[in-house]
From Swiss-Prot:
Name of the protein in its database record: UPF0335 protein mll3968
Superkingdom assignment: Bacteria
Record-stated family: Belongs to the UPF0335 family.
Native source species: Mesorhizobium japonicum (strain LMG 29417 / CECT 9101 / MAFF 303099)
Membrane-spanning segments: none
InterPro entries on file: GapR-like, GapR-like_DNA-bd
Pfam families listed in its UniProt record: GapR_DNA-bd (PF10073)
Molecular-function GO terms, alphabetical: DNA binding
Length: 86
């Protein structure tokens, strides 16, 4: 009886593990598809004449709140002034 319970538990655990792994694999494939789509959009932007490095910077900055951006800018200005770059 105890062996049946242990075997059932192992079967359930194996099934859960398999399901989790398959979900991760599907998500990884979706992530790859999305990354390819993003790459295509950047290629389109470059083909239109936009600077993709600037676009990437803008996207990175838009993810931050205003206070965080201002703090980052202040530190950058301070460092540039210390190096005589401004």
């Amino acid at each position: 009886m105890a062996d049946d319970i242990t075997e059932t538990s192992q079967t359930v655990a194996a099934g859960q593990l398999r399901a989790l792994i398959e979900r991760i694999e599907r998500l990884e494939e979706e992530k790859k598809t999305i990354a390819d789509d993003i790459k295509e959009v950047f290629a389109e932007a470059k083909g239109t004449g936009f600077d993709t490095k600037a676009i990437r910077t803008i996207i990175r900055l838009r993810k931050k709140d205003q206070a965080e951006r201002q703090e980052e800018d202040a530190i950058l200005d301070l460092y540039m002034a210390a190096l005589g770059m401004v």
